């Protein structure tokens, strides 16, 4: 059975990776263009007037946050759109009735989201080299934070797809939750610039820990303890994974299949 599960996992991975690579002009190019505009506008044009932050130029300061923002957005979008499309077309029913454990299904879709997030992250990092010199303080923390964040938001995208009933529902969470939390997560500023009340409030934003941890990997500076960063990521991953497992485990007629039959 282990061989069967491995074949199923590789098949889902291959399907998910081929899906976004087949339309790479739509999935990989737009985020790179968007981040390039951020580099030009906020880094070159505005950053030259802001000055240094923690001993680094403003461009050097925001690059890790912009890379992480691209990874978050694309890992989330890949799984949310792919799983909901399969659900909408009722292709997911074939997977749910197959002798494939729920863990394998989740790992397959999450693997696709992580792959897209990492691809975009690498491309954005390559573009950033035209603006700032490449500098890494801790390869371990760069890789760890990047991987855990991509896994977390792939799981979040899966949750969104499970609950969504229409394609409009897919855009609600990114628009009203993900985007505000990302922009308020310390991408463009250090938490030390905020008044004490807003600093304390910012610590309730989980994206703050991801961006601070990733920035530490590149620059060696952070606004939050590193142990807290890893702990927050691990706790959220476990919670989201268990919730995804519970919702998908409700077979053979989960809530979304009953919804389709009731229409």
Give short role names for the model-derived ranges.
Residues 1-32, 254-257, 261-262:
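Aromatic- and glycine-rich beta-strand/loop motifs that create alpha-glucan
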Residues 22-48, 62-73, 179, 232-239:
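Hydrophobic alpha-helical transmembrane segments of multi-pass membrane transport/permease proteins
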Residues 102-174, 221-245:
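Alpha-helical transmembrane segments and their short interhelical loops
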Residues 23-26, 61-65, 72-77, 107-109, ...:
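Short alpha-helical transmembrane interface motifs in multi-pass membrane proteins
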Residues 29-33, 166-185:
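Pore- or pathway-lining transmembrane helices of multi-pass membrane proteins that form conduits
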Residues 20, 182-240:
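Membrane-interfacial helix-loop-helix junctions in multi-pass membrane proteins
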Residues 35, 39-43, 212-263:
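Alpha-helical transmembrane segments of multi-pass membrane transporters/translocases
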Residues 33-38, 58-130, 157, 175-176, ...:
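Hydrophobic alpha-helical transmembrane segments of multi-pass membrane transport proteins
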């Amino acid at each position: 059975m282990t061989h069967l599960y491995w074949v199923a996992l590789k098949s889902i991975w291959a399907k998910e990776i081929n899906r976004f690579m087949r339309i790479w002009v739509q999935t990989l190019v737009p985020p790179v263009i968007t981040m390039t505009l951020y580099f030009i506008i906020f880094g070159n044009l505005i950053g030259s007037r802001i000055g240094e932050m923690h001993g680094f130029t403003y461009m050097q300061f925001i690059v890790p946050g912009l890379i992480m923002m691209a990874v978050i957005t694309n890992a989330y979008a890949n799984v949310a759109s792919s799983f909901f499309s399969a659900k909408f077309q009722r292709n997911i029913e074939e997977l749910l009735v197959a002798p494939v454990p729920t863990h394998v299904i989740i790992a397959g879709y999450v693997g696709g989201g992580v792959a897209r997030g990492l691809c975009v992250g690498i491309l954005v990092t390559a573009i950033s080299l035209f603006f700032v010199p490449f500098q890494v303080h801790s390869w371990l923390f760069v890789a760890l934070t990047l991987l855990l964040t991509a896994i977390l938001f792939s799981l979040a995208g899966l949750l969104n797809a499970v609950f969504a009933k229409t394609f409009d529902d897919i855009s609600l969470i990114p628009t009203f939750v993900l985007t505000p939390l990302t922009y308020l997560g310390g991408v463009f500023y250090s938490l030390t610039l905020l008044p004490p009340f807003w600093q304390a409030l910012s610590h309730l934003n989980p994206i703050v820990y991801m961006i601070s941890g990733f920035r530490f990997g590149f620059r060696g500076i952070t606004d939050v303890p590193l142990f807290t960063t890893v702990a927050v990521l691990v706790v959220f991953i476990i919670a989201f994974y268990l919730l995804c497992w519970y919702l998908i485990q409700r077979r053979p007629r989960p809530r979304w299949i009953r919804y389709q039959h009731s229409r």
